[in-house]
Structure formats: structure tokens, C-alpha cells
């Protein structure tokens, strides 16, 4: 069971308030997952967005609808990205440019994302192929690696050249409430979670 009694999940471009000032939105994804959960937190005269969805035409359109309708035409004040996966960071660059706001994320996630984007269009390195073969990958797995290598950046709008670094245990204000950063790894190298004790 979902812990919030919010009624039905939001449709594309819609939002559901799950806590005072915290809006739950869903952005479309292709494939089995179908959607990614993203968040908008009331922040003064605008919204702090947490995660953005992938860089696709459908996701961009869903955000345009959300900006106009669900978020009431208010500006985005900052974009917080929890980790480097394209379904979370894909439109961060687009959004920060559109609203002239800062990208906030952990250092390792930002730098690793930039590194992976730099490989876009390149062929799989022979060193990588040898490494994975020695690690026991079969020919199908190696071919999948070769075919998919260099595609990471295709789902990510160009990132800004600078960002505001998030650190584990750091606290800051969003919309008059104190939020704490809690980092972890496993799903990604330095994933950031946001925690607000008041909510």
C-alpha cells in the first residue's frame, strides 16, 4: 500500500499534493517502467523540482503542461537531482536554462554523469571488452555492452557547466522548511535523498 492517502496517481502533466507544499508528478518513460516519479516542492514564489525525467519529446511536453497548469505558471527556483540516471537527470539542463536557476546534486553524481555523457557516440573500448570477458561475461552480454556503449548522453539535455554541491548531512531551507540530505550508494555512486522531519 502507498503510505499517502492521495487518491489516484497523477496523470501526465498533473500533480497530486502528498504533503503540505509537496507535489507528486509522474513523467513518461518508454519500456516496462512507463513512468518516473518526480517532485515539486513549494519554494517561496516558485517551485523546487526534484528529478526531471528523461530528455524526450513526451517528457518535455508533460513538463510544459505541468508548468502551466499543475504548478500554476510559477517559476522553477532550483533543480535538485538525486542521481545521474537519465530518467532522473535527463531534463535538468533544459530546466535550469529555461528558468535560469541552479542545478543541485552531489559531486560524484555530477562528475560521473559528465564523464558518461562525454562517451556519447564512442565505440566500446577494447579495455572494457577485455575486462568484462575476463569477468565471465558471455558473448551475448559483451555484444549488448558493445551495442549500448556511447548512448548515455542521448537521453540527457546538456548539463550546466556549474552546479551547487549537495553533501551528506547538509541542511537547507526549501519553502520555509528544513530539508536534510542523506546520501547512499548502490543504486548509483552517491545518491541523494531529501528528508524533512516536519513532514
Regions flagged by a language model, labelled:
Residues 10-12, 167:
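A short, surface-exposed loop/turn module that caps and links secondary-structure elements
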Residues 26-29, 88, 183:
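Conserved HGGG/HGGXW glycine-rich cap/lid loop of the alpha/beta-hydrolase fold
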Residues 21, 41, 51, 83, ...:
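Divalent metal-coordination and catalytic microenvironments
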Residues 1-7:
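N-terminal presequences and immediately downstream first alpha-helices
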Residues 58, 65-173:
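Active-site HxH/HxHxD metal-binding segment of metal-dependent hydrolases
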Residues 47-57, 149-157, 161-164, 171-173, ...:
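Metallo-beta-lactamase
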Residues 12-74, 194-199:
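Conserved beta-strand hairpin/beta-sheet module of binuclear metal-dependent hydrolase folds
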